[in-house]
A protein has these predicted regions:
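Cross-family detector of peptidyl-prolyl cis-trans isomerase
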Residues: 2-162
Length: 162
């Protein structure tokens, strides 16, 4: 009867593969067992509430009209969209009110698509609320601190048209 011998290197390789396989299976099981059973956090991009586009004139101005190709000066306040909040306003993210007005050329892609869509037609002195779905705001990528797939609410006051 012939005795089969295994070299120590082959035995170690077989043992190492078996051990690694067992450890991998154990780790996968532990990870599954320790998973978070709670619902996703409210800030998770997959659970953010989605808004439909809307624009509402809060105050109609009396000055020059905002048209594409013109440089505008505005004050704005930005909130996360929250359907339970007043006028869809959730957490305030940013404002220029009380600071330096924001200036941009309308209709050139210098701002998010929702502004290029929602600001034309405003008159100096006017205030408008824009509710923007993600594709008219910062999309899937977001723009920290704004998470991806966030719907946003802006209130914009038109200060100047050049």
């Amino acid at each position: 009867m012939k005795t089969r011998t295994t070299s120590p290197a082959i035995a170690l390789t077989t043992l190492t593969r078996t051990t690694l396989a067992v450890l991998l299976i154990a780790a996968m099981g532990a990870a599954a067992a320790c998973g978070d059973d709670s619902p996703s956090s409210p800030n998770s991009p997959t659970t953010l509430p989605r808004a439909e586009y809307s624009q509402t004139d809060l105050l109609v101005g009396t000055g020059s009209e905002a048209t594409n190709g013109r440089r505008l000066s505005v004050h704005y306040t930005l909130w996360m969209y929250d359907p339970a909040g007043s006028n869809g306003k959730g957490q305030q993210i940013q404002t220029s009110v009380g600071g330096t007005p924001f200036s941009f050329v309308l209709g050139t892609g210098a701002v998010i698509a929702g502004w290029d869509r929602g600001v034309p037609g405003m008159l100096i002195g006017g205030r408008r609320r824009l509710v923007l779905p993600p594709e008219l705001a910062y999309g899937a990528a977001g723009n920290p601190p704004i998470p991806g797939n966030a719907s946003l609410v802006f209130e914009i006051e038109l200060l100047g048209v050049q």
